[in-house]
Amino acid sequence: MNFKKFTAIAVVGLSLVAALIGCSDQKKDDNTLTVGFDQDFPPFGYVDENGEFTGFDIEMAKECADRMGMEIKLQPIDWNSKDLELSSGSIDCIWNGFTMNGREDKYTWTDAYMDNSQVFVVKADSGIKTHADLAGKYVTAQADSAALNALNGEEFTELKESFKELLTCSQYNTAFMDLDAGSVDAIAMDIGVAKFQMEGRESEFVILEEPIVEEQYGVGFLLGNTELRDEVQATLEEMVKDGTFKKISEKWFGYDVCTIEVEDEE
């Protein structure tokens, strides 16, 4: 290889390395908050009859971004790929009924803003009343969901092993169709989503009284991204203080779901 050709290649190589280093150190310099969410997770995030993204968390995120002086980009994601979306920088946060419990060390979190529980939904005429009645039954849960993670945990080994099979689904709309058709006997899922899906069909489906696990929702950021987390946390606290959080909660749930504690202003 002649010297000139070698030098040219070396310069290009060094330029690429410098560019990559620059990219890795580059802070987010645009003014957009890109929110990753599952668009099939009502009432937290979903597509309405007009084809628009809506939901409790969507409305909260929009209000938060507006107060922070940022444009918001709502980015639907495959829930099973959420970590890749976050680590690649495709999204800034996951804000969509995102369970903190068991994931505390994987993300940088806001304070928990809402309590939640994972439950089983069955057909009303199935005869299934308790967890014990699920023995020999087909149970489904969304891939990489908190419900699936709970059932795969040591605490629920005996229960899981009693199932005929623990299946996974990509979205809960599909799960309810499978339940209605008899392809599965129970769905493990978030109680808020279950209640939304069951609206107008309470005679067809029931939620078992005993929950799988109690948990909390938070907004999750890439581990170490405390700067953006702190901005969002402070804005959420403002929304609690001025009553906006309560107003949005009551619109979607009929009551105030907020669990963020703020000091009373003197």
Where are these regions (language model features)?
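Short, low-complexity disordered leader/linker segments with a strong preference
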Residues: 1-32, 258-266
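Short helix-initiation/N-cap motifs at beta->coil->alpha
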Residues: 58, 73-84, 165-181, 215
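Acidic, polar ligand-binding/catalytic clefts
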Residues: 62, 66, 71-133
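Short glycine-rich His-centered loop
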Residues: 32-55
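A ligand-binding cleft/hinge motif common to bilobed small-molecule-binding domains
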Residues: 97-106, 152-153, 178-214
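Extended ligand-binding regions for polar small-molecule ligands
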Residues: 58-67, 128, 132-133, 137-138, ...
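Periplasmic-binding protein-like
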Residues: 39, 115-122, 191, 195, ...
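Ligand-binding cleft/hinge of the Venus flytrap
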Residues: 47, 61-69, 147-168, 198-202
